[in-house]
Amino acid sequence: MKNLIAELLVKLAQKEEEAKELTVQVEALEIVVTALLRHMEHDAQQALIQDIEQAIDQVTPCPPVNDQDAMLLQQYLKKLLRHPRS
């Protein structure tokens, strides 16, 4: 029983480490996207945002994702593109 608990704790620690790495990657990408958007002229920025939003609207995920996950992705993209980090 102790071995099982120890194994579970090790797996949990690994998952937490993976989650931290993903969080850092997402934050780094947010910073890069924000910097790129800020260095673009307004018209080019708006055109890029519209292209991204249209591409997201046209994509059909395979395998299909649930509506809540799709909505979460759309909300996050809108926040990132329309209201970038300060």
Swiss-Prot record:
Main location group: cytoplasm
GO cellular component terms, semicolon-separated: cytoplasm
Subcellular location: Cytoplasm
Keyword Protein biosynthesis listed: no
Protein biosynthesis found in the keyword field: no
Top-level taxon in the UniProt lineage: Bacteria
Coiled-coil ranges (or none): 1-38
GO biological process: cellular response to starvation
Pfam families in alphabetical order: Anti-adapt_IraP
Keyword terms: Coiled coil, Cytoplasm, Stress response
Transmembrane intervals: none
InterPro entries: SigmaS_Anti-adapt_IraP
Entry function: Inhibits RpoS proteolysis by regulating RssB activity, thereby increasing the stability of the sigma stress factor RpoS especially during phosphate starvation, but also in stationary phase and during nitrogen starvation. Its effect on RpoS stability is due to its interaction with RssB, which probably blocks the interaction of RssB with RpoS, and the consequent delivery of the RssB-RpoS complex to the ClpXP protein degradation pathway.
Quaternary structure (record): Interacts with RssB.
Protein family according to the UniProt entry: Belongs to the IraP family.
Name used for this protein in its record: Anti-adapter protein IraP
